[in-house]
Amino acid sequence: MALIKCSECGNEISSSAKFCPQCGASVEQHFCPECGVKLKGTEINCPECGFPLTKKTASNIITENLDKITGAKSENYVTFKDLFKYTFKKHSEEDLDNVFVCGSSSTTPDVKDVNPKKASAWVYFKIFIFFIIAYIPTRIGYINYGNLNFLPAMIMLGAFAVPVTILIFFYEINLFRNIPFYKVIKYFILGGALSLILAILFFSLDINTDISTYSGALMVGLIEEVAKAAIVAFFLFKSKNSNYILNGLLIGAAVGAGFAAFETAGYILRYGLAGGDAVMLQTIKIRGFLAPGGHVAWAAIEGAALMYVKGFEKLDKKHLNDKRFLLICLISVVEHGIWDMPIEAPYYLVPIGLTVAAWLVIIYFINLGLKQIDDAKKLKN
């Protein structure tokens, strides 16, 4: 156990002490209990000796392995709880309006004014409530009154509700506020459609895509993730303002949300025609419930990975061949493949477990994105 000196009385105390036993002064600074080096308080492992500063959890294990893949030294800027702590707090209409006013030269803050500790989201929940309120009368109109005019609206609202909600979450945590909302909508609509078409072209090749087999399910995962990653990369190369990890998360999420929404709308209609209204409603519920861990999350990871390997360089084709980018994308491919595999487990345990794993990766990249804000400030000084 390392010893440090109290800043008030100079008495030697343990580096893990919270108060000086001699004078009672609070030890506000953080030190490694193993080697005594001064810390910022956000580190997971000591940067000097590698001593673990947090308890071993599934999250920490995933973080450590991601650090090995990326070569980064991640820090805990925010936790999952921090990101959602303002969800149920009261906000004014002006607060709501301000969230969507960004992306122009006059509404994009300077990097030095961006506080990485303030990453949180709350508008996403309001958007979800709007979808639910709109969905209920369309369902009543079609199911209770048999009016077919309500069917298209019910399908679209049921398919779009959760993907769009998650997309708004990523829009909110893009603290750089350098991507206007109309571009997010563009990436959502065009990205979703283009990635679906690209996937269909791959599916037309003579390869096994039968998800009743393990190899076929894995091939489906590879095809769809390559299609989404290609479109995400295309948008990132075309965008002049998207230079950061949080931007990659957002644009990736937009493409993934579009893919998920359009695909789900098709499944709802197809299964409904084949199995009736009960099957249609069940499809809406199940795909909505599982949507947070699917296409939106996987594509967001791919976008974040590309912007991470780019760093502060100009995005180049060489970054697409970066081993770190390919390995991170492989996570999405494998997750997608396992998701589609014919694995029997009760209560959707497989997709729920994969959702948790995907979001641990997302939180990892959110923290890297917040750390990048501090790094960008240092470059400007």
In which residue ranges do the predicted regions lie?
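Short, intrinsically disordered linker segments that flank or connect zinc-binding domains
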Residues: 21-25
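Hydrophobic alpha-helical segments at protein termini of multi-pass membrane proteins
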Residues: 8, 26, 34, 38, ...
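A detector of tandem-repeat and repeat-rich interaction/domain scaffolds
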Residues: 4-5, 10
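The −1 position to Zn-ligating cysteines in a subset of zinc-ribbon hairpins
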Residues: 5, 19, 31, 45
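Short, low-complexity disordered segments enriched in Ser/Pro/Gly and basic
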Residues: 1-2, 28
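Short functional micro-motifs and their immediate structural scaffolds
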Residues: 14, 18, 28, 40, ...
